[in-house]
C-alpha cells in the first residue's frame, strides 16, 4: 500500500497516451504563421509578382513600366523648382519698340492692299522698309470685328435649339464681358490708350496715379520715367542700356507703375505712316466704373475712444 501511495504522489514518469494529442496541438499552435487580414487571405498581395498562366513576360514588356531617363533639362527644371532662379533674363532694347508700337492705334488702309503689304509696320523703325523684301511668312491683313462679337452671333443665328441652354450661354458671355471691362479699366489706369499724336485719351473718370519709388512708396516728386530711345538695326538685340527701373520688376510687379512716354521719333514716323491710312483705336475705352466701396464705419464700444 505504501509503495502504491508513493507512486501516485510522484506521478507518472512519462505522459499517458491520452495527453499526447493535446501536447501536439499546443506545439502545432506555436508554429502557426502570424494571423492575416481578410484582404490578405482573399486577394493577391500587390508586392508579390504573379503572371497569367500560359504567358511569360518578356524583356520588352518592362519598357512600359520603366520610367524615362532623367535628362539634363529635367534635372535643371527640378533644381529651379527647389532653388528659385535669382538672376532674371534681361529684355532687349528692341523689346521696348514692340511695346510702344502696341500702344498706338491700329492703321488700316483706305483701300485693301492686294496683296497685303506686310512691311507697313517696318516703316516705324526703318525708312527704307518699302525696299525690303516681304516677310518670309506672309502676314494676313488686319481684321476689324467691331460689333460683330460672339454675343451678337448668338442672338442673331439660331445656333441653339434649347432656349434654356441659350439663355445660360448668353448669361455666361455677358458675365465674362463685364469681367473683361473691369480688367480693361485696370490696364488703362496703368497704360492708358494713346491717339495718333501720342497723347493720352483719358475717360471722364480717369485718375492719374502718382509715381512710385523704388521702395514701393508713393512719392509726389518721385522717379520720372524717360522715353526709351530708338535702337538701330544692329542694337535691337542688345540688352537695354537704360539703367532706370523703367520696366516692371519682380518687386513692383503688382504696383501701379505708369508706362514710359513714347519716343518723339516713333510718333513722327507713325504720323507719316497714317497719312494715307485710317487710324482706329485698338479697343474701345472701358465702360466699367471704378468700384467705390464705402469705408466701413467702426462702432465705438463704450469706454473706448
UniProtKB/Swiss-Prot annotation:
Kindly name one Pfam family recorded for this protein: DUF4532
Q: Where is this region: Disordered?
A: 284-305
Point to the regions of Basic residues compositional bias.
294-305
- State the superkingdom: Eukaryota
Tissue expression pattern: Expressed in Testis.
Q: Which PANTHER family match?
A: TESTIS-EXPRESSED PROTEIN 52 (PTHR35156:SF1)
Name the UniProt record assigns to this protein: Testis-expressed protein 52
| Annotated source species | Homo sapiens
Amino acid at each position: 500500500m505504501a509503495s502504491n501511495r508513493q507512486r501516485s504522489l510522484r506521478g507518472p514518469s512519462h505522459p499517458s497516451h491520452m495527453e499526447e494529442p493535446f501536447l501536439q496541438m499546443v506545439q502545432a499552435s506555436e508554429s502557426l504563421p502570424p494571423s492575416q487580414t481578410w484582404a490578405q487571405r482573399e486577394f493577391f498581395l500587390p508586392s508579390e509578382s504573379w503572371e497569367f498562366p500560359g504567358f511569360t513576360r518578356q524583356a520588352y514588356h518592362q519598357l512600359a513600366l520603366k520610367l524615362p531617363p532623367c535628362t539634363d533639362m529635367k534635372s535643371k527644371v527640378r533644381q529651379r523648382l527647389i532653388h528659385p532662379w535669382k538672376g532674371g533674363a534681361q529684355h532687349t532694347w528692341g523689346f521696348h519698340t514692340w511695346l510702344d508700337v502696341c500702344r498706338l492705334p491700329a492703321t488700316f488702309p483706305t483701300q485693301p492692299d492686294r496683296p497685303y503689304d506686310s512691311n507697313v509696320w517696318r516703316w516705324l523703325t526703318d525708312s527704307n522698309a518699302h525696299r525690303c523684301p516681304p516677310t518670309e511668312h506672309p502676314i494676313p491683313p488686319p481684321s476689324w470685328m467691331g460689333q460683330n462679337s460672339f454675343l451678337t452671333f448668338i442672338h442673331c443665328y439660331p445656333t441653339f435649339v434649347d432656349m434654356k441652354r441659350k439663355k445660360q450661354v448668353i448669361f455666361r458671355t455677358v458675365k465674362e464681358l463685364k469681367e473683361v471691362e473691369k480688367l480693361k479699366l485696370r490696364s488703362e489706369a496703368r497704360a492708358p490708350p494713346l491717339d495718333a499724336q501720342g497723347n493720352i485719351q483719358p475717360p471722364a473718370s480717369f485718375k492719374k496715379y502718382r509715381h512710385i519709388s523704388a521702395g514701393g512708396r508713393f512719392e509726389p516728386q518721385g522717379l520720372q520715367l524717360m522715353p526709351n530711345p530708338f535702337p538701330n538695326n544692329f542694337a535691337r538685340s542688345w540688352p537695354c542700356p537704360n539703367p532706370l527701373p523703367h520696366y516692371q520688376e519682380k518687386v513692383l510687379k503688382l504696383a501701379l507703375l505708369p508706362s514710359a512716354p513714347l519716343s518723339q521719333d516713333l510718333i513722327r514716323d507713325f504720323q507719316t505712316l497714317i497719312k494715307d491710312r485710317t487710324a482706329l483705336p485698338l479697343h474701345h475705352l472701358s465702360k466699367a466704373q471704378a468700384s467705390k466701396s464705402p469705408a466701413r464705419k467702426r462702432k465705438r464700444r463704450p469706454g473706448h475712444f
